[in-house]
Regions:
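Conserved polymerase palm-domain catalytic core
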Residues: 3-10, 60-154, 158-163
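Active-site-proximal segment of RNA-dependent polymerases
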Residues: 8, 16-70
């Protein structure tokens, strides 16, 4: 008989989006995983949500430019499946990537099934950023010319330039 596991106390909707409240085990695991990823992966300077007051700092970088573009990735966290989390943790050398991926994901609240990264867990932002950074989007952002100002805050990408 399959055994169920719970890594959250409950969930609620905020602006129509499911938010998960981690239990004590998940809070502790999130703290450990945050440390492990931070020690093993260096984020590009245009990833702003790991700094104090970062959303304001990120936007100020764009103020002197003439043209502006903002991209919001819909359901970004909930599009990141457990296997992807495991694969990226393994790639940066985090021990027991299957374990951390299992306990960092929840059953997908949207159609599509599987287990996904939830909003509300302590480790979700750094895991989502790791995956975005190593995705074709992250590679594209790194390849943009220096004349383009770029910033990433959670699932929002801002680009700006003078021409």
């Amino acid at each position: 008989m399959p055994i169920t596991f719970e890594n959250f106390k409950g969930s609620y909707l905020k602006k129509g989006k499911p938010i998960y409240v981690p239990n004590d085990f998940s809070l502790d695991l999130g703290k450990k995983l945050l440390r492990k990823v931070s020690r093993r992966y260096k984020f590009d300077p245009f990833f702003y949500h790991f700094k104090d007051g970062s959303h304001v700092v990120a936007l100020h970088k764009h103020r002197e430019n003439k043209f502006f573009c903002r991209v919001d990735i819909q359901r970004f966290f909930y599009s990141i499946k457990r296997n992807r989390v495991k694969r990226h943790l393994k790639a940066i050398g985090v021990p027991k990537p299957e374990y951390y991926a299992k306990w960092s994901t929840v059953r997908n609240p949207y159609p599509g099934g599987g287990y996904v990264l939830p909003y509300g867990f302590r480790q979700s932002p750094i895991l989502a950023s790791l995956i975005l950074s190593e995705s074709p989007v992250g590679i594209y952002l790194r390849g943009l010319p220096a004349t383009i100002t770029k910033s990433v805050f959670m699932d929002d990408i801002c680009l700006s330039g003078m021409d």
